[in-house]
Regions:
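Ferredoxin-reductase
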Residues: 1-46
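Short coil/loop residues immediately preceding or within conserved phosphate-binding loops
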Residues: 9, 66-67
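A short, basic/flexible loop-to-alpha-helix module at the beginning of a structural domain
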Residues: 54-64
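Conserved S-adenosyl-L-methionine
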Residues: 66, 90-97
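Conserved beta-strand elements of the Class I
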Residues: 69-72
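Ser/Thr-glycine-rich phosphate-binding loops at phosphate-binding pockets of nucleotides
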Residues: 74-80
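Histidine-anchored nucleotide/phosphate-binding helix
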Residues: 80-92
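Reductase modules of NAD(P)H-dependent flavoproteins
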Residues: 100, 107-215
Length: 215
């Protein structure tokens, strides 16, 4: 947004699929946040400033094909995955596309109902072909799934709940986006397993959103 004649900018992931004619973002209201305190009050017709080119490291072309594609998110880190789970290309090279998403409280699971009904949706259900699986979790309230998604993978509870095989190097791949501690923990977890990070030159076993990690 333009504030006092100067652009006030923050990095946001695009949550809408690449074939849509609109752009969707997912944000939380930060108390007294310089941008979000203003962003929450915009109205139809108001202008927002966007870059002319999207950048990022969560790119399917940076990953190997495989059995299961895991999307691992905390908080608003789910935004790029909201775009990908509605993308045709996402389902072409994997048997399952599995989204693990944790937030602090239930109300922050803003896309929960949509994601739970994705396979049955009259439009996106034709894209997912039943391949999409969703594991929401909450860390600070009672919920059907509680705790960090890292722990759910470590103890195997997520695999049992979803009826899928445990993550295995050479068969499965992952995309990571969320808080810095979660990103770094999963990065170490996969590297300790012998997995390689993918990039634009070499397809790998996992990718993560570096704008969260390298600050």
């Amino acid at each position: 947004l333009e504030v006092e004649g100067k652009p006030l900018l923050r990095a946001y992931s695009v949550a809408s699929p690449n074939y849509e004619e609109y752009m969707e973002w997912f944000s939380i209201k930060v108390p007294n946040g310089p941008l979000t305190s203003r962003l929450q009050h915009i109205q139809p017709g108001d202008e927002v400033i966007t870059n002319s080119k999207a950048v990022g490291t969560l790119v399917l072309d940076n990953l190997k094909s495989g059995r299961n594609l895991y999307m691992l998110a905390t908080g608003t880190g789910v935004a790029p995955f909201m775009s990908l789970v509605r993308g045709v290309d996402t389902y072409e090279n994997y048997d399952n596309v599995i989204l693990l998403w944790s937030t602090r409280v239930v109300k922050e699971l803003a896309y929960k109902e949509f994601l739970e009904g994705l396979n049955d949706h009259e439009i996106w259900g034709e894209i997912t072909q039943g391949k999409f699986k969703f594991y929401p979790s909450v860390t600070r309230e009672d919920f059907v799934n509680t705790g960090r998604i890292t722990n759910a993978m470590y103890d195997g509870s997520v695999y049992e709940k979803l009826g899928v095989e445990p993550f295995e190097k050479g068969k499965d791949v992952a995309m990571i986006c969320g808080s810095m501690p979660m990103n770094l923990e999963f990065k170490k977890y996969f590297e300790d397993m012998g997995c390689k990070e993918g990039n634009s030159q070499t397809r790998g076993d996992f990718v993560l959103e570096k704008s969260f990690v390298e600050k």
